[in-house]
Amino acid sequence: MSLNEFLSLNPLAFVMTAGLIGLLIGSFLNVVVWRLPKMLEREWRLQAHDVLDLPAEAPGPTYNLILPHSECPHCGHRIRVWENIPILSYLFLRGRCSSCAAPISKRYPLTELACGLLSAFVAWHFGFGWQACMVLVLSWGLLAMSLIDAEHQLLPDVLVMPLMWLGLVLNSFGLFVSLHDAFWGAVAGYMALWTVFWLFKLVTGKDGIGYGDFKLLAMLGAWGGWQILPMTILLSSLVGAILGVILLRLRDAKTSTPLPFGPYLAIAGWIALLWGGQITGFYWQFVGLK
């Protein structure tokens, strides 16, 4: 019996396998969230030197998602293999560096746990098949983008655009929706927030939404089609408004303080992709139009 046959015939094994892989991916996403913004900043600095015709900076050490090896940001202690086991290492080390005893951010085990649970749920929801595998990839990408946007107010094109093209390619085979719906989902997703951006700017003279949000909604439209866009925009706006007010209260910040919108779009789009049809059907039934 092949591995594919075993996983397709044993749903629990597929869910557990997806959860374990999700834990490992979550550990890697911690690296992506930490390093990718720094890598982009380096790239932008080099581009700025070229555009402004400034003297070239001395080349620094190699810095990417692989090198240098992970180390403690406080003392520089190189993280060994046994110290990098998802969740377990954090518990074994009691949340502190083995060298300097500095506290390790709780974001690392929480990201690993969230990714593992998310992966297991996707596997359970879809069952073994291409849909589950591709939604896993999408979920990992959305999690990374959400964490980066929450911390840096940045949605990197290097994450958003490949996923948008992947959605279009997958739907050229009709994996989730037709290519026609996916294409217009991408176009409408971008144009919807682009229109809101310029209307808000004309009225207030301020930027209300980032360009990364346009691309993120376009990417979600490429996966789920134009049909999921109204629900995605509505859910993200409601959740963003509620949580935004709560965060502003907790931080004692002003209403002009910028808040990232990407995480709310990501959550709403993920929900709409998985349950959009059921939620819409329930709504029409609730209002008596079905």
Model-derived segments and spans:
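Alpha-helical transmembrane segments
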Residues: 5-7, 11-35, 39, 195-207, ...
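Short microdomains enriched in Cys/His and/or Lys/Arg
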Residues: 90-131
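Membrane-proximal soluble regions of multi-pass membrane proteins
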Residues: 35-107, 261
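Interhelical loop and helix-boundary elements at the membrane-water interface
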Residues: 82-85, 99-109, 147-159, 199-212, ...
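Structural signal for the C-terminal ends of transmembrane alpha-helices
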Residues: 124, 146-150, 170-174, 249-251, ...
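Juxtamembrane/transmembrane-helix boundary motifs in multi-pass membrane proteins
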Residues: 6-14, 103, 107, 126-131, ...
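Functional transmembrane core segments of multi-pass inner-membrane proteins
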Residues: 18, 131-239, 281-290
